[in-house]
Every structure is written in C-alpha cells, then in structure tokens.
Amino acid sequence: MEIGWMHNRRQRQVLVFFVLLSLSGAGAELGSYSVVEETERGSFVANLGKDLGLGLTEMSTRKARIISQGNKQHLQLKAQTGDLLINEKLDREELCGPTEPCILHFQVLMENPLEIFQAELRVIDINDHSPMFTEKEMILKIPENSPLGTEFPLNHALDLDVGSNNVQNYKISPSSHFRVLIHEFRDGRKYPELVLDKELDREEEPQLRLTLTALDGGSPPRSGTAQVRIEVVDINDNAPEFEQPIYKVQIPENSPLGSLVATVSARDLDGGANGKISYTLFQPSEDISKTLEVNPMTGEVRLRKQVDFEMVTSYEVRIKATDGGGLSGKCTLLLQVVDVNDNPPQVTMSALTSPIPENSPEIVVAVFSVSDPDSGNNGKTISSIQEDLPFLLKPSVKNFYTLVTERALDREARAEYNITLTVTDMGTPRLKTEHNITVQISDVNDNAPTFTQTSYTLFVRENNSPALHIGSVSATDRDSGTNAQVTYSLLPPQDPHLPLASLVSINADNGHLFALRSLDYEALQAFEFRVGATDRGSPALSREALVRVLVLDANDNSPFVLYPLQNGSAPCTELVPRAAEPGYLVTKVVAVDGDSGQNAWLSYQLLKATEPGLFGVWAHNGEVRTARLLSERDAAKQRLVVLVKDNGEPPRSATATLHVLLVDGFSQPFLPLPEAAPGQTQANSLTVYLVVALASVSSLFLFSVLLFVAVRLCRRSRAASVGRCSMPEGPFPGRLVDVSGTGTLSQSYQYEVCLTGGSETSEFKFLKPIIPNFSP
C-alpha cells in the first residue's frame, strides 16, 4: 500500500495521488447496505448508530451527516435516531445502466473529532422492464440448399434489467424446419440463432413466418416478441468473409462528430448480385446505435455522437457483411475510448465552520472532497491555497481534505479571510477548479480597554454649581460586540481621608465626570483619583487611569487687615516727631488675602487724609511714610484711611484707619488723657503737683535719651521707627498696659511703654529697648 503525497509549507500545496487500491484502508469501513430499487422515499435502510456503536445523542451532537459524490442526496440520515432512510426513489437502470452490481458509495462524516466512515449501498434490481426487440420484424434470406445445422443469427432482445431479470431464454413458434439456439456474449448478454433442422424447398414453401419470443428470468417472467420472416432464395455458394475477424481500434474521447473510427472490409467470391456486399451493424445496443454508424457500401465506421471516457470506456461492436444472395459474415470491432483531460477537478464541500474563534490554533475550518472523473494522471490532483494565509491543507481519508488554522488568529488584526481552494489535475493541459471560502473570525475578549491618556488633568473653578460637568475620560477596546462595550467607574482612593464619593461622580456609559458639590479652593486646592474602564467580556478585562483635579481660585475673599486692628476696639495712634524727615516711616499696613495668585496680590493707596500731601502710602508694601517736612501749622492729630485692594476680577478691597499724633519731642508727648472728675481733682491736688514735677524731670531725661537714640537710628535706617504707643482716646485703665510691637516695624527698635496707675498724673516709663534677633 503506497500513498504518494507531498506537502510544501512554503507553497501550502498538498499533492495527493489517490490510487483506489491504496485507499482501501484509508478510512474506517462501515459496511455494505442494500436496497431494492423503486423503494418508496423515507423507507428504512439501516441504523447507523447501532452499526457504529454510538448512542442516540452522540450522532446528533457530533453533527453526523451523509456525503454522496456529486452532491446527489440519495440517502438521508436522521441524526436524532441514527436511522438511514431513502431520500428519493432509486432507479437502478438510471443510476448504473447495465453495470452489475449497482453500488453507490457514500461516506458518513462526524465532527468533534472528525471521522469519516466509508460505506456503500447496493441497489438491487427488480424485474420492472420487459424484453424488447429493436425490430418488430426480421427478414432472413436463406438459400434453399443450406445444409442442415446451419445457424442464422437473429436480433437479440434488449432488457434494461440485469442479472436474472435480463433476457434468459428465447423461444420460436413451432416449426418443422427451424429451432432456436442461444449463445452468450462476453458481457453476459444472450442472443438467438436460428438453426436449420430440415431442408428448405423454395418451390414448396418460398416463405415462412415465425414468432420469436424473448423471456427474462424474473418472477413472474416478462416477455417480448418479434416476427421472423424467412425468404427462401436460390443457391448462393459463397458467404462474405471479413479480412479480420476482430478489429481493435482506439479513439480519443471528445472526437468530433463524423470522425472515422475504423474501416472494415469483406470479400465474396461470388459474382454478380451474389458478390455485392453491404455492411450493417449487427444487433447493436441502443447506445451503440446512437454512437456509431457504418457506411453500407464502404464499411467505414464513424461517430454519430461524441464518446465520453467517463461514461463508457469501450465498445464491442459486431458488424455484418451481407451479399446479394442473402449470405452474410460477421466481424467484431473492439473500440477502446482513450481518456482525454477534459474534466476539471470537482470540489465537494462537506463541512464549513464560520465564524471560528480567534486565539485557537488547529481549528478545522472546512472538510471537502476532491474528485476527477478522468483517469491516470488526468485524474490525479494537486490542492493548494494562497501563500499568505494562516491556514493549512491536510489530507484526510481517501479523497478528503481538512482545512485547519496554522496558528492562533487575531480578529483585531484581520476579521475575515477569503480563501481560494485551487485544485489542479496532472493532465495535459492541466485543468483547475477554484472554490472560494469566506471565513469570519469571531471575537474573544483578549484586549483590555485602553484609555486615550494615561492620566487626565481637569481644571475646576471654585464655587462651581453642583452636578457640573468637569471633564471626561475615554477608553477604547479593540474587541467587538459586548467585549468592546466599556463601563467606567471610580476606584477607591488611595488617600482614605479623601471623601471622593461626595466630590465627583462618573457616568458609567460615557465617562463624563461631574462635581457633586461646590468646591472651595481655600479648603481643597487639588485632589486625584483613579478611574477604571471595564469591558463586558467574560472574563471581564479592565484598565485604570489617573485623574487629577485642580481647583482654580476665584476672587471670593476680600483683603483682611491684620494691622492696625480694625475690630472696633480703641484705635492705635502712631507717634511721629515733627522733626521727621520726608520719607519717614510712620507705620506699615499689614493685610492678607485668602485667595491665591493675582487674586491675592494686594495694592495700597491713601484714600483719605486730614492733611492731603503730608503722608503717602507705598502701593506694594503698605508702608506709610511722610511725604514732606512737618510744620507747626500741621494739625497734631492726623487721621488716615488706607485702601487695600486685591488684583482679582472684579477686585475686592478693605480699608484701614490710622491715627497719627504729631509730637514736638518724646520728652513732652501729648496724650489725650481723660479729664478727672472735679471731686477727685481736689482730693488729689498734692499728688498732681508731685506728678507734674516728676514728669518734667523725667521728660527732660527722656528727651535727651531719645535724641541720642534718634540720631543713632537715623544713621542705621531711615525706615526704622523710634517707638510706638497705644493711646486710647478714652479713659486709661487703672493697670499696667504692655504695648509690644504688633505693627510692621518688626526690624526697628521697640520700647515697652508703661503707664502707671494710681494717680491722675500718670507718667510714661521707658524701659529697655527690645531689639529683635535676626537670623544670620
């Protein structure tokens, strides 16, 4: 047993030489079944499930089905029960003609796993045709001097049935001169010959009429009749003789009509009319009569119709030569039809799986069979597909192939393949057949959603309205269908203290993000969280992205003045010596703004002043300085209103009110002390005098010290202040008041100024200077 095949991976061609003998064991043999022709449609033939040893459900789940050559469905299989039934009435004569036995080959194909079982159905002949003679009357011219025992051939009857149902016997009507002798062709057909048993005498009986009856072997037998007319003629001594008893010729199939097949020749030694020969086909079958004709004068045998090797491979033709006297001779013409490569290969698709899942290698895509009615190399085939496809052709049993995937496929790279099966025979010239297959690739959830960005930065201005759409995230999935449907969700924040659920929400369908409440920049400047995108495949795949939300500041806070305090308490009064030079630092307005950026950039300007032009405010730092030299005409009490404004849109502002007291010298400061009640003044007059005297002495001493200090300070920094004092305009409390540097003069000398209580003539007490510690 030898199977010759060649598989070239680069060319993806499969060369398979199918030899009938070598394929006898290629697949599992199921067996042979038989059915009588003309059996009604739906009749039971066999139970394949039992023959294969399979259960009822296995036949159905494995998609068992019948495959017949040429797509003729003579049989049908009930997969639920395993019953093999007749699909249509079978006419044995139409299916097989004279061939006996009449066998129809079929296969049983089952999937998961792929198995093909070979089987055959034998169609049993019934006696449904009667014998028929091609001629209702046969004329024989028999010389009267014919010797006893001479045989005269008669036309045989035709019966489309085969075997015992074909013609089995011939009978002749009772006659004293003749009897019937039956002979048999090599193909089994029987033909009659008339045997002379008693001498003829033309003068007594010039003509005889007999009835020839043909009987078949059926039960009951059928019959057909023909008339035989015998004309007794005068003596003709010599019968025609052919030059060859057998002529063997070959003719290519598909030869044109009228092609010369052969020329037969006979001779007759008689002269005259008895030596004139005519040629005829002797007892031709219907097929031979339609295929060949002989020229009665020349003996040329020509084609009446084209011969087809695939239908009939050879003909056995008997030719009779008859002379003018009625004598005849016969020869046999053996005509061999030579095969020509005139049939392209045929592809029969048995199973096709589409779509097929991606990521699954070695999947059977299709099962098909290849056949070529030609013979020899003309019937050998090569099967192939395109080079650039991830598929392979594998030979299966007999003439079957399976088309399988070479590797795992990727639907995202290519969702459809158009495969062309090319089957070429080995004849000359080569003929080919192409069969197109479209294979769809079904999606498997093998791609996780992908965000368009790995991180998103969103900007939201504070004081937003709730449910404001602040931005969107977007993810795509290369899969298809439900595997590509993306659902968005918020992932738990990494910061457990971040109330993410109350800050933002996300639309699960489109990824839109919404602020759930109004955001406050001063409370939360920024926050971040993770968003997940999950597809709806099984199992579901997901991916996440980082979202940063930056809260943009809005100008929703007005400047707040830290110094001087504007809380409604007694205002602070700044002391300025009248000897101060222009640019003398009086104080510094300190303010802050809860906003940020430009909204927190503050500018200062003098809004109101008792003496316009006497003081100025630096716009960027809030320092209040003298604009010119002080004069005696300037009022001792000055009231300044400073406007503090931010740089927002629209701008917000606040005002600070300053009280400035112009003094001639620090030894005699002017203090707006409260006037004592008249009764108390009289009771403490002595104390008042003592206090005034002590104050005068102290003032002189203090003036000297301050003068010295002022000179030193002016050398160091003209921007430094010489002192600060809280001077309430109302009554002083009867306790010690500690006034420390709370203004902006943090880098200047500061003094602790204490007022002693207990007398109406309270005095200033200058203590040690407080010198701040500066970091190196």
UniProtKB/Swiss-Prot annotation:
Keywords: Calcium, Cell adhesion, Glycoprotein, Membrane, Repeat, Signal, Transmembrane, Transmembrane helix. The lineage of its organism: Eukaryota, Metazoa, Chordata, Craniata, Vertebrata. The keyword Repeat applies. This is Protocadherin beta-16. Its main location: membrane. It comes from Homo sapiens. It is found in: Membrane. Residues 712-776 are cytoplasmic. Residues 29-690 are extracellular. Gene3D superfamilies: Cadherins. It is a single-pass type I membrane protein. SUPFAM superfamilies: Cadherin-like (SSF49313). The chain crosses the membrane at residues 691-711. Glycans are attached at N418, N436, N567. Disulfide bonds: none annotated. It comes from the Eukaryota. Potential calcium-dependent cell-adhesion protein. May be involved in the establishment and maintenance of specific neuronal connections in the brain. The keyword Signal applies. One of its GO terms (molecular function) is calcium ion binding. GO terms for biological process: calcium-dependent cell-cell adhesion via plasma membrane cell adhesion molecules; cell adhesion; chemical synaptic transmission; homophilic cell adhesion via plasma membrane adhesion molecules; synapse assembly. Pfam families: Cadherin (PF00028), Cadherin_2 (PF08266), Cadherin_C_2 (PF16492). The gene is PCDHB16. Residues 35-133, 138-242, 247-347, 352-451, 456-561, 568-671 form the Cadherin domain. InterPro entries: Cadherin-like_dom (IPR002126), Cadherin-like_sf (IPR015919), Cadherin_C (IPR032455), Cadherin_CS (IPR020894), Cadherin_N (IPR013164), Protocadherin/Cadherin-CA (IPR050174). One of its GO terms (cellular component) is membrane. Residues 1-28 form the signal peptide.
